[in-house]
Amino acid sequence: MPEITTIFNDGRADADIITALQEKSVEVREWTTELIKLYEPTEHTIVRDKQTRKDKVRSDGTTDVAARIYLGLEKLLVSRITSFMFANPPKRLYHNTEENDTRKNIAKAIELIYKHARIDSENIKRGKAYFASCEVFTIWYTVESPNTLYGFPSKYKLKCKSYSPMDGVKLYPLLDERDDMIAMSFEYTKKRGAESISFFETYTADKHYLWEQSGTGWKRIVDGEKISIMKIPGVYNWRPEPFY
């Protein structure tokens, strides 16, 4: 697999760069019509089955529609396993803070970041996406907004957002031969008036890129925005098969 620097630095056209970034490095069950019909009870076969559950036609021509009752056990299973993990919110432990005020303040700030990012409700969303659609990506980002939410004056707020196939987002993790992530890309659509516009976004350890679909091609609208922490600012989780 080519190094990420090669993908961006060998003079490729934007369409070719995106094609290379779409080389998904993990194998997961795709969130297609097949899985959706399993997960969504209203899509179960019994709802439309008129062969094994036939309607009864009376002698006077009236029809008694057969009872077709679906059971959303797959969705219930996903909800239950997510509740097992997150109904009682995980608690984080901080060591070696007892006699160090600086460390205590850091731990307090971390907890306030999670609180104001609503991490507990975000975890529920992430859990359902992970167990139902096999993958989820959570990105952390800053918003310029002066505040004192974290116990000290700050110019920025730290927020997070999760993406999954259940939201119509395609995820493309790119790993090297040691399974270290070298790029994380995702493709999504947004409404602009009556028009749906496709976007392709990529994060590497030091750069952020964003393309917008323009006509039949792609237009780069964020070209290598610097990531100062030198890490992909997100977490990707995946499993080969759905929990159900």
Locations of the language-model features?
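Extended, helix-rich architectural segments
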Residues: 1-166, 175-179
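Structured, contiguous alpha/beta core segments that scaffold functional sites
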Residues: 133, 141-244
